[in-house]
Each structure stands twice: as structure tokens, then as C-alpha cells.
Swiss-Prot record:
Keyword terms, alphabetized: Leucine-rich repeat, Repeat
PROSITE patterns named in the record: FBOX
Superkingdom: Eukaryota
Residue spans of the LRR repeats: 158-179, 185-206, 207-228, 233-254, 256-277, 279-300
Pfam families: F-box, LRR_At5g56370
Species for this entry: Arabidopsis thaliana
SUPFAM superfamilies linked to this entry: F-box domain, L domain-like
Protein name (database record): F-box/LRR-repeat protein At1g55660
Length: 364
């Protein structure tokens, strides 16, 4: 019990100390030590040296725990402090590379560093790998780099959580290795923006529990169905669609699913939604594809606004933002929901009874 209390406190203290120590070291020291700076700040260097000598006496396990509280960039920069620290960061269970507004040369340097860091990573498994690249020079980090990093994370490091966000990254959506669809270790998968979801015929994701698909592109209309059909323990699914992404009718048939969030806005296309998830407890649908009541495609009986919900006996909470009129068909199978939030973008006189609701919010 004593260790359970003292270790988090010690980690918090050392993390604050590291932040201060790293603040004494200029950013260019990550690439090359500047001798003139060392001369002009000899006192600070001595302070850092004395503190590091004391900290370095701690066991590796505790030091790695401390480093895990720092950003990956700061954790890596500690490798220059002494030989004792040179490879400690390679045992980090979580790696996060978040870059924006990078030049061609910076992007190329980042690509080399990330490749080498994944190749020499020593932890038995990567608990979390996050790669986020935004507003960089297109072509500086290539799609083949992303392909390689995901392959290394899957084959070498048994990654458990993978998060990819690629914005303003390449002219075409980035393709991921098919091995990702057969990764037995992955529990959380988040894909966002310029990524191609190309699902092979053989898929096996036995551990995947959380899936986030944000504004991605699908290789064909059945890609999502093949993916979801092979996630036997999936519990949380989030989808955001705001473009032509090659999906037609959306089928969410996952017996284990407990939470579903679906957000759609123009110009994404949908030929209807079919859902059969008897374990569902929370459902959120934001459908903003209509701009006005005068829209040429505002016919609520059109297949593109047809929602086929199977019975959801365990549904406890639902949150809807809708812009089409025929809502009675929409709510036919969820009248047993206990907590409902409803925001309508159109006027309707239809009456719907929710016999089991104990909390109801309606906005228009």
C-alpha cells in the first residue's frame, strides 16, 4: 500500500524536475551540443549534473515510468544527458509523434528518426503509438513511411493502441498494410483524415474494442462491412463522414457493440443505415446532410434517409441531431430508451411515445 502511494508521488515530482532540467537545455542540443552555450552557463550545467547523478541512481523501471509522463520529444532528449540515459527512452510503452507546419528537410529528418526509433524499440509491446502530421510539406514524409511504421508496430512491437491522423499529407489517401487487419494485439484503432481503409477478404481483429474512423476513404462499398464483421469483441464505434468516401448502404451488425456514434454531413452519400446491435447501450446520430426544407433530395422516404434499426433492448441513452422530416420511422425501434436528447432541424407534427423514458430533451 505504501508503494502504491509513494511511487506516483515520486513520479510526479521527478517529472516536474525533468521539465525544469530540460528547460535548461536549448532545443538545438538535441542535434548538437553548442560549446559556447556550455561555457556561458557553467553554473546551470553543474546543477543539472549534480541532480542527474542523484536521479541516475534510481532503478531503470522507475526512470522509464518517469519518462512516460513526458512528451516523447522530451523523453528522447534525455538521451544526451549521460550514457546512463542514452537508451532508457527506448523502453517507453507509449510513443507520440505530433508534428505540424514542418518543412521538407524537417519531414525527411523526422521520417529517418521515427523509422530508427521503431526498429530499436526495446519494450516487449507498444502500449500506444500516435502519429499525427498536419500542414506539413507534402512529400516530405511519404505514404510509404507510414506504411513501414505501421508494419513495424504490428510485427515487431505488438502495438495495442494505434492512432493515425494525416491532414494535408498527400495527394491521395494513404494506404495501410494489410497486416493491420490481422493484428491480434490491437485493442484501440483510430484512423482520421487522408487514410484509405482497404480491408482484405481475410480479417482477424480478435482484441479490437474501440474503433474510430474519422473522414477516411474506403476502397469499396463493402470495406466497412468486412471490417466490422471480423471484430468479435468491438464495443465502441465512432464514425465521422463529410465527403464522398465510397460507402453506399451502411451496415453495422456487431453483436458485442455497446456504443455507436455516427456523424454525417454534406457531401457524404448514404443509401440507408442498417443496424443490428442487441448489446447497444448508447447511440448518437448526427445527420446534417440536408441544408434546407427545399432541398431537392429532402424526401424522407428516399433510401438515403432510411434507417433500419433492429430491436435494441439494452439501449439506455440516445442523442440525435436530425434534419429530415419523417422521424417516426426513425424512432420506431427505440421507444424503450430511458434518456433521449433530440434536436430537429425541421418542423414536424408527428407524435412519438417513449414509454420508458425518464429523461427527455427536445430542441428544434
Amino acid at each position: 500500500m505504501f508503494l502504491c502511494v509513494i511511487i506516483p508521488c515520486l513520479c510526479s515530482y521527478l517529472c516536474s524536475l525533468f521539465s525544469w532540467l530540460l528547460g535548461q537545455i536549448p532545443s538545438f542540443l538535441f542535434d548538437k551540443i553548442n560549446e559556447s552555450w556550455l561555457t556561458s552557463t557553467k553554473r546551470n550545467v553543474e546543477i543539472v549534473k549534480n541532480l542527474m547523478d542523484k536521479i541516475s541512481q534510481l532503478p531503470d523501471e522507475l526512470l522509464v515510468k518517469v519518462l512516460s509522463f513526458l512528451s516523447t520529444k522530451d523523453a528522447v532528449s534525455t538521451s544526451i544527458l549521460s550514457m546512463r540515459w542514452k537508451s532508457l527512452w527506448m523502453w517507453l510503452p507509449k510513443l507520440e509523434y505530433n508534428f505540424r507546419h514542418y518543412s521538407v528537410s524537417e519531414g525527411q529528418g523526422l521520417a529517418r528518426f521515427i523509422t530508427s526509433s521503431l526498429r530499436v524499440h526495446k519494450a516487449p509491446a507498444i502500449e500506444s503509438l500516435s502519429l499525427k502530421f498536419r500542414y506539413g510539406a507534402i512529400g516530405s514524409i511519404k505514404p510509404k513511411d507510414i506504411y513501414l511504421w505501421v508494419s513495424l508496430a504490428v510485427h515487431v512491437s505488438n502495438v495495442r493502441e494505434l492512432s493515425l491522423k494525416l491532414f494535408n499529407f498527400a495527394e491521395l489517401p494513404t494506404k495501410l498494410p494489410k497486416s493491420l487487419c490481422k493484428c491480434k494485439s490491437i485493442v484501440i484503432l483510430k484512423l482520421k483524415d487522408e487514410i484509405l481503409v482497404d480491408v482484405p477478404r481475410k480479417v482477424c481483429l480478435p482484441s479490437l474494442k474501440t474503433l474510430f474512423l474519422g473522414r477516411v476513404t474506403y476502397s469499396d462499398a463493402n470495406s466497412l462491412h468486412r471490417l466490422l464483421s471480423n471484430c468479435p469483441v468491438l464495443e465502441d464505434l465512432v464514425m465521422e463522414r463529410d465527403k464522398i468516401d465510397n460507402l453506399g448502404k451502411l451496415s453495422v451488425i456487431v453483436k458485442s457493440l455497446q456504443r455507436l456514434t455516427l456523424k454525417m454531413s454534406r457531401p457524404c452519400h448514404l443509401d440507408g443505415l442498417k443496424m443490428n446491435s442487441p448489446s447497444l447501450k448508447y447511440l448518437k446520430v448526427i445527420d446534417e446532410r440536408l441544408e434546407s426544407d427545399s432541398d431537392d433530395e429532402s424526401d424522407s422516404d428516399s433510401p438515403r434517409y432510411f434507417y433500419d434499426f433492429e430491436d435494441m433492448p439494452k439501449l439506455e441513452e440516445a442523442d440525435f441531431v436530425l434534419t429530415f422530416q419523417n422521424i417516426k420511422k426513425f424512432f420506431g425501434s427505440i421507444t424503450s430508451v430511458k434518456r433521449l436528447s433530440l434536436c430537429l432541424g425541421v418542423y414536424t407534427e408527428e407524435v412519438i411515445c417513449f414509454h420508458h423514458s425518464i429523461h427527455l430533451i427536445v430542441e428544434q
